[in-house]
Amino acid sequence: MSKIEPHAARIRAFRADQNGTAAIEFAIIAPVLFFTLLSLVELGVLGMMTSALDNAVVEVSRRIRTGGADAATSASSFEDQICDRMGGAITGCRDRLTISVQKFSAFSSAGAAASAPPAGQFDKGGANDIVLVKADYRWPLMTPFVATAYNRDGPLEVTIAARAAFKNEPFQ
């Protein structure tokens, strides 16, 4: 018997032992799996926030459209109403929300202005005026993968935009 045979027998026994292989495979796959799950959850929350902002803008804009927004309605109270309808549990909503309410003479000019970010104007117009309500909400992201999907190189946040264009009713 040579000196190599006992070592070769131990090496063969070591290679034949399959204990712990699943743990090693899981350790390799786990970070990718958890990162993917976190990204999916974040995309779901982002979709929910987009829907919440759209619905809040439509609901609050209805008060302008029907003449229910009195002269005391200001940009800050309008922001408060949007934040309340988005869900009161969102902290810092007012700091992350930017709105703009503008009146136009034609829908074509309102459509051209819809792509620009809100600049803070607040002119709800009068009866039969065409009004464009713009709201942008800066949503913080948790995963850089989602930020990359939105082509963001800077801070981990994405801007959720909601627009509502309408003609005011002939209110008094």
Per-region residue spans from a language model:
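Alpha-helical assembly-interface signal, strongest on the long, hydrophobic N-terminal helix that forms
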Residues: M1-D84
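Short, conserved structural patches
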Residues: S2-K3, E59-Q172
